[in-house]
From Swiss-Prot:
InterPro entries: GPCR_opsins, GPCR_Rhodpsn, GPCR_Rhodpsn_7TM, Opsin, Retinal_BS, Rhodopsin, Rhodopsin_N. Residues 328-349 are annotated as: Disordered. Residues 334-349 have a biased composition (Low complexity). Retinal double cone accessory photoreceptor cell outer segments. It comes from Danio rerio (Zebrafish). Belongs to the G-protein coupled receptor 1 family. Opsin subfamily. It comes from the Eukaryota. Disulfide bonds join 110-187. This is Green-sensitive opsin-1. Pfam families: 7tm_1, Rhodopsin_N. Visual pigments are the light-absorbing molecules that mediate vision. They consist of an apoprotein, opsin, covalently linked to cis-retinal. Residues 1-36, 100-113, 177-202, 277-284 are extracellular.
Length: 349
């Protein structure tokens, strides 16, 4: 056995030397040098100071500007809300525990951090699925003339939270569990043990199939179809230039958000899958810590991409930050608003 299993923890180190200690009661400096824990704490601090303001700013700006409250933007606000929850209830725990070198908040703090990290990550993933399907319906028009309404957007948001809860809640009630992972200062579902009491194997198979493979496959299918349709429409000049431009802008923005999410989560999911399918294989706590902490950047990627690529939101954000006097002026925001509205109600050619 290449690891040590205890009450509510699994450490990827044999206890033959007697070094292993509970991550809830003792510093874990035998897993890595103290400076590496401080480096993780600094990394989490950066995610907090960038992630919290930009996610909250997204919510505030959308609340202040009525023209941003379009059906397409509902799901983007949902992403920002999920990111805010991750920062407040997850990142702060990881920051503090990395700073002190162990899971100082105990099993309850571990469960809280693991739950909110899983919940936020799943809301983000399923929000991107809803975005992909919405773009597919509007641009590829498989349903003919279709207008994406506020009711559709709210149903999409409800769907994202239902799916996220169906993944994050079971470990709270005995189907799997949340354990410290990596250098034992952040937490996630139990991929490591075969404890029959928690039915970990069935949960991990369910999670990978229903909450990773299916949504990622859906995203790739819809965007593959979407890219082909946009290229064909541009070649045939089937739609107005402003509509084509707006479709390209929105599509580029959402594709980058998807790539950002995959960039953050695929390394973690891949490493967790390797651990699950190679039970007993040796791996270091530091090797697991890197993808586990890197996955948390997804809470920062999406709002940054949204701010950089959405001219309408950028104009409204500057308007808010400069107390009602946007340096870009009103002409650009008006033209962008018109094009975005046009995209949401495109009829078949």
């Amino acid at each position: 056995m290449n690891g040590t299993e205890g009450s509510n923890f699994y450490i990827p180190m044999s206890n033959r030397t007697g070094l292993v200690r509970s991550p809830y009661d003792y510093t874990q400096y035998y897993l890595a040098e103290p400076w590496k824990f401080k480096a993780l704490a600094f990394y989490m601090f950066l995610l907090i100071i960038f992630g919290f303001p930009i996610n909250v700013l997204t919510l505030v700006v959308t609340a202040q500007h009525k023209k941003l409250r379009q059906p397409l933007n509902y799901i983007l606000v949902n992403l920002a809300f999920a990111g805010t929850i991750m920062v407040i209830f997850g990142f702060t725990v990881s920051f503090y525990c990395s700073l002190v070198g162990y899971m100082a908040l105990g099993p309850l703090g571990c469960v809280m951090e693991g739950f909110f990290a899983t919940l936020g990550g799943q809301v983000a993933l399923w929000s991107l699925v809803v975005l992909a399907i919405e773009r597919y319906i509007v641009v590829c028009k498989p349903m003919g003339s279709f207008k994406f309404s506020a009711n559709h957007a709210m149903a999409g948001i409800a769907f994202t939270w239902f799916m996220a809860c169906s993944c994050a809640v079971p470990p709270l009630f005995g189907w799997s569990r949340y354990l410290p992972e990596g250098m034992q200062t952040s937490c996630g579902p139990d991929y490591y043990t075969l404890n029959p009491e928690y039915n970990n194997e069935s949960y991990v198979m369910y999670m990978f199939s229903c909450h990773f493979c299916i949504p990622v496959t859906t995203i790739f299918f819809t965007y593959g179809s979407l890219v082909c349709t946009v290229k064909a429409a541009a070649a045939q000049q089937q739609e107005s230039e402003s509509t084509q431009k707006a479709e390209r802008e929105v599509t580029r923005m959402v594709i980058l958000m998807v790539l950002g999410f995959l960039f953050a989560w695929v390394p973690y999911a891949s490493f967790a899958a390797w651990i699950f399918f190679n039970r007993g294989a040796a791996f270091s706590a530091q090797a697991m810590a890197v993808p586990a902490f890197f996955s948390k950047t997804s809470a920062v990627f999406n709002p940054i991409i949204y701010v950089l690529l959405n001219k309408q939101f950028r104009s409204c954000m500057l308007n808010t930050l400069f107390c009602g006097k946007s340096p870009l002026g009103d002409d650009e925001s008006s033209s962008v608003s018109t094009s975005k509205t046009e995209v949401s109600s495109v009829s078949p050619a």
